[in-house]
């Protein structure tokens, strides 16, 4: 039974992170009517930027700010140079173009940072809670991610149904 609870808590945490990516896809879909698969590459690319800034400066927060700015720049470039011109011709062409951008961003990241995956350290404690004589795998970081997802889902629900 304990193993089941461990897996359940781990699954909730992983599912919350996947839900954040899904929310990003939905947000872009609602505004452009194009499924932008390049977002996955943009997220990976800006995470590597944040990791690099953090390694150079030691500041997690500065890495976050610079990564968000880089994400904005990359997103605007992808939208105006790839999605917008191709979407006028064909929606499926725009979707295929976003796959091309995804592949290009992955290749560029591999050239700059190498092919080995790296984990971005969490901003807060990522070790589990100790309770009832054992360590539970759900950490304060997992709670932060889950709470963020719930708040974003509720906020986007209000925006999409009230505007």
Set out the residue ranges of the language-model regions:
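Small-residue-rich transmembrane alpha-helical segments that form helix-helix packing/gating elements
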Residues: 1-32, 37-163
């Amino acid at each position: 039974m304990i193993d089941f609870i461990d897996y359940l808590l781990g699954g909730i945490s992983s599912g919350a992170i996947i839900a954040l990516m899904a929310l990003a896809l939905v947000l872009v879909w609602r505004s452009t009517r194009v499924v932008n698969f390049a977002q996955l590459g943009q997220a990976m690319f800006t995470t590597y930027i944040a990791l690099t800034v953090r390694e150079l400066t030691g500041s997690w927060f500065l890495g976050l700010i610079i990564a968000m700015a880089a994400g904005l720049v990359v997103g605007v470039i992808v939208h105006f140079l790839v999605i917008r011109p191709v979407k006028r011709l064909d929606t499926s062409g725009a979707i295929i173009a976003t796959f091309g951008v995804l592949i290009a961003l992955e290749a560029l990241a591999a050239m700059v940072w190498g092919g080995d995956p790296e984990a971005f350290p969490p901003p807060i404690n990522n070790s589990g809670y100790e309770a009832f004589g054992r360590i539970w795998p759900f950490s304060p970081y997992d709670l932060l991610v889950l709470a963020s997802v719930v708040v974003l889902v509720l906020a986007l629900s209000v925006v999409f149904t009230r505007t």
